[in-house]
Amino acid sequence: MSKSEQDFTRFVALPDPRFAVEAEERKLCVSGVEFGARYTLTFRAGLPAESGEGLIKETKIEFYVRDRTPKVSFPGRGYILPSSGEASIPVQTVNSEELDLTLRRVSDRNILRVFQDDLFAKPLYRFQAERLAGDIGEEVWSGTGLTESVLNQDSKTRLPISEAIAGQPAGVYVLSASLKSETYRYGTVAQQWFVLTDIGLSSVAGRDGLQALCKNVEAVSACGTA
C-alpha cells in the first residue's frame, strides 16, 4: 500500500457504516467486525499500491471471522473459604461448556517452593502445572465443572466446590481448571489459590495502637479466647 496515502476509506466499500479501515505496514485492516460472522468487502479501482500502481478493477472478497479461541481463567487472586457449608469459586470462560478440575493441597513446607518457582496466582504452562502436581501439591479431588457459555462472549460461572473440600483439613489449596477439548489441552492451566479455614484474621490501626481481630468465618462471630 502507498505510504503517502493515509485514508483508504474511499477505496473500500464496507458492509457496515460502523466499520473502519486503516493501513498497518503492508496490511489493510478492518475493525469493528464480529467473531463468527461472514462479510464481503469491495475494493474499488484505484486502490494504490506501494509501487504507485492502482487496482485495475473493482474486486470483491468474502471472508469469515473465526470464533474466539476457547479460554478459561480465574478473575480472583485468592479467597478464604470456610471448611464447612456451601462454597463456590468464580471462573471466567470463553466458548467452553465443561472444564477439567483438580484440587490440590499444598503443605506448609512447600509454600515457599511455590513462590521460589513463581507458581503462585498465575496461569501456568503445562510443564509448570506438572511440577506443581508432582512435586509440590497433593491431589485430593478431581472432577468436571459445567459452565455457562454464550458464543464468543466472556461468561462467568460460580463453580460449586463444597463436595471437593468436604472433610479436608484447614490449609492452602489450589484449584486447577483446563479446557475439556483435546484440541486445547496444551494451553495454559488456570489456577485459583485459596485458604480453607474457619478462622479469619484482620487488623485495625488506631491512636491506641494495632488491634488484631479473630473471627469465625462461617458464623461471622468472634473466636472467644483465641
Regions inferred by a protein language model and the residue ranges of each:
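N-terminal, cleavable Sec-dependent signal peptides of secreted/periplasmic/extracellular proteins
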Residues: M1-A226
